[in-house]
Amino acid sequence: MNDLITNLALPQEVINAAGSNNGAGIGYGLVAVGAGLAMIGALGTGLGQGVSAGKAAEAVGRNPEAEAKIRLMMIIGMGIAETAAIYSLIIAILLIFVY
């Protein structure tokens, strides 16, 4: 019964690719999707760093005397936020090259 549903739902080329062991099967496709989803972490990091830099520029505009402290806190915050993007990149690379 399962073969009947598979044969009706999928073209023969897809079934052959899923059964082959040449790296082009559904398993590798799911790995690629997982790597892409892992890189969504970089999207959040980029947005967060952009907001952080904008707010720091506003704060320096309102209080120029505190520019050194504001810049230091912004750089520390961006460094902490960047670790999420680095971890996402490592996971994506591991998914692609280890599988």
UniProtKB/Swiss-Prot annotation:
It comes from the Bacteria. It is found in: Cell membrane. One of its GO terms (cellular component) is plasma membrane. InterPro entries: ATP_synth_csu_bac/chlpt, ATP_synth_F0_csu, ATP_synth_F0_csu_DDCD_BS, ATPase_proteolipid_c-like_dom, F/V-ATP_Csub_sf. Pfam families: ATP-synt_C. The chain crosses the membrane at residues 23-43, 78-98. Keywords: ATP synthesis, Cell membrane, CF(0), Hydrogen ion transport, Ion transport, Lipid-binding, Membrane, Transmembrane, Transmembrane helix, Transport. The record marks 82 as: Reversibly protonated during proton transport. It is a multi-pass membrane protein. Its main location: membrane. CDD domains: ATP-synt_Fo_c_NaATPase. GO terms for molecular function: lipid binding; proton-transporting ATP synthase activity, rotational mechanism. Signal peptide: none annotated. F-type ATPases have 2 components, F(1) - the catalytic core - and F(0) - the membrane proton channel. F(1) has five subunits: alpha(3), beta(3), gamma(1), delta(1), epsilon(1). F(0) has three main subunits: a(1), b(2) and c(10-14). The alpha and beta chains form an alternating ring which encloses part of the gamma chain. F(1) is attached to F(0) by a central stalk formed by the gamma and epsilon chains, while a peripheral stalk is formed by the delta and b chains. Belongs to the ATPase C chain family. F(1)F(0) ATP synthase produces ATP from ADP in the presence of a proton or sodium gradient. F-type ATPases consist of two structural domains, F(1) containing the extramembraneous catalytic core and F(0) containing the membrane proton channel, linked together by a central stalk and a peripheral stalk. During catalysis, ATP synthesis in the catalytic domain of F(1) is coupled via a rotary mechanism of the central stalk subunits to proton translocation. Key component of the F(0) channel; it plays a direct role in translocation across the membrane. A homomeric c-ring of between 10-14 subunits forms the central stalk rotor element with the F(1) delta and epsilon subunits. HAMAP family: ATP_synth_c_bact (MF_01396). This is ATP synthase subunit c. It comes from Mycoplasma mobile (strain ATCC 43663 / 163K / NCTC 11711) (Mesomycoplasma mobile). The lineage of its organism: Bacteria, Bacillati, Mycoplasmatota, Mycoplasmoidales, Metamycoplasmataceae. The gene is atpE.
